[in-house]
């Protein structure tokens, strides 16, 4: 009598927000290449469907498209409920959805500031609130929060954005201790200026950004690769690029008043 055929082990599942472009899209390739099935979350259905088809064809993985506007307070809860009903609890949660506005604070509308807070802070917090308990109940999981090099110092003309990313970094560091010995790790990816659609939009608003030397602009695929590797290794903080790491270390040892002064000079020089 033939032995019963063993069922192949299910592939790990990675949920990526902000998956339709930039670092988020690049990260979907990293996880798919490593054999993860994907849940793709962003607002654009067309972009997500095109990405899902590409991932399936290139890596032979499953890719579930779940369009959502995470700026809506209920969106994270709806995602969690839907995946729970499907018995699809992510092994990896990647919080990459975000928005950037580069202008002096008073030149922006209150709605612009609120949009950054809603997506960069509130949506990320809601995703963690709904998905971390599932991972803890299972006893395993990984989280990758996309912050920014701007999280380490004040950045005039990026005041709200930098503050929102400082929140992400601080929250990640705090949770890394709360989650110790739980089987769940959490990582903050803190990229510098990266060649993405977000940078293109910022450059349209401020043409001086387009004059930055190429060596200061990170490659999106390399940033994603380093973030992926840090997440899988359980590192708490990942700062891609030698220059960015040097800037991060300098910011942690430089007096706050001097950081503010230098930031102000740079903001005026690029305004």
Annotate each language-model stretch with its function.
Residues 178-246, 260:
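SDR active-site lid
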Residues 148:
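Residue(s) in the substrate-gating loop at a strand-loop-helix junction
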Residues 104-106, 112-117:
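Substrate-binding pocket helix/loop in short-chain dehydrogenase/reductase
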Residues 36-51:
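Conserved glycine-rich Rossmann-like NAD(P)H-binding loop of the short-chain dehydrogenase/reductase
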Residues 96-101:
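Conserved NAD(P)H cofactor-binding loop of Rossmann-fold oxidoreductase domains
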Residues 20-22:
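Conserved glycine-rich cofactor-binding loop
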Residues 128, 164:
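Active-site helix of classical SDR
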């Amino acid at each position: 009598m033939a032995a019963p055929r063993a069922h192949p082990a299910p592939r790990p599942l990675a949920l990526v927000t902000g998956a339709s472009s930039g670092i988020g899209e690049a990260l979907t390739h990293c996880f798919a290449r490593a054999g993860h099935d994907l849940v793709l979350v962003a607002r654009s259905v067309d972009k997500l469907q095109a990405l899902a088809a590409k991932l399936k064809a290139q890596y032979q993985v499953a890719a579930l498209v779940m369009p959502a506007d995470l700026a809506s307070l209920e969106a994270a809860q709806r995602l969690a409920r839907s995946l729970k009903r499907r018995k699809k609890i992510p092994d990896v949660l990647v919080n990459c959805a975000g928005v950037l506005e580069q202008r002096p604070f008073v030149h922006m509308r209150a709605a612009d500031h609120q949009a950054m807070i809603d997506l960069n802070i509130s949506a990320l917090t809601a995703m963690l609130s709904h998905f971390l308990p599932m991972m803890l109940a299972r006893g395993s999981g990984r989280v990758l929060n996309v912050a920014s090099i701007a999280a380490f110092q004040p950045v005039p003309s990026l005041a709200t954005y930098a503050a929102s990313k400082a929140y992400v970094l601080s929250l990640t560091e705090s949770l890394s201790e709360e989650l110790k010995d739980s089987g769940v790790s959490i990582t903050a990816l803190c990229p510098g200026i990266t060649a993405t659609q977000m940078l293109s939009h910022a450059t349209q608003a401020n043409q001086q950004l387009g004059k930055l030397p190429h060596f200061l602009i990170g490659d999106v695929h390399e940033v994603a690769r380093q973030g992926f590797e840090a997440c899988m290794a359980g590192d708490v903080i990942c700062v891609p690029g030698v220059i960015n790491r040097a800037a991060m270390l300098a910011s942690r040892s430089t007096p706050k008043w001097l950081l503010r002064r230098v930031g102000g000079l740079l903001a005026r020089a690029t305004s």
